[in-house]
Amino acid sequence: MAVVNVEVRSPLSPDEVLRVLTDFSERRAEAWPGVDLDRLVVHELGEDFAEVTEGNATTWERERYEWDRAAGTVTAKTLDSNVWGEGSRWDYRITPVEGGSQVGVRLERYGKNIKGKLIGALLPVAGKKVITDGLRSALKLT
């Protein structure tokens, strides 16, 4: 198992951060460069949940997103993936702060094959920077 924790401050309000995290339209690929539009499939979308397949040629996963606006949380649990196994997930915590939001992210990855285990082994080394940079970039979009 690989775990990465990051904290990012954003000028966006908590509601704006939540919108970026839960926007499954074609804008998702603009906010998250690791998501290819041709691999983005929204299977089900509700008021506070979504089941989505997203990713790129290297890695993809089908996830169940659930969010709670009042609590400021978003969770994405992996249902299927070409590299990640059961228990893999993203947890976001959005806290209002003066001038925007503080966003905490916890990523847990369980490699289900050799490719997943190799990528997972690199996460503690390079994952924090990659996730932090990606999140900072995405949260500048409104």
Q: What are these model-predicted stretches?
A:
Residues 25, 29, 123, 127-142:
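Short amphipathic alpha-helical signal-transduction/dimerization elements
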Residues 36-82, 137-141:
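Glycine-rich portal/gate segments that line the openings of hydrophobic small-molecule binding cavities
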Residues 11-15, 45, 67-72, 93-102:
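A short, structured loop/turn motif at beta-sheet edges
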Residues 1-47:
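Hydrophobic ligand-binding cavity/cleft-lining segments
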Residues 2-5, 59-64, 85-91:
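Short, surface-exposed coil-to-beta transition loops
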Residues 77-132:
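Beta-strand/loop substructures that line and gate deep hydrophobic ligand-binding cavities in soluble
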Residues 17-21, 65, 76, 103-105:
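Hydrophobic pocket/interface hotspot
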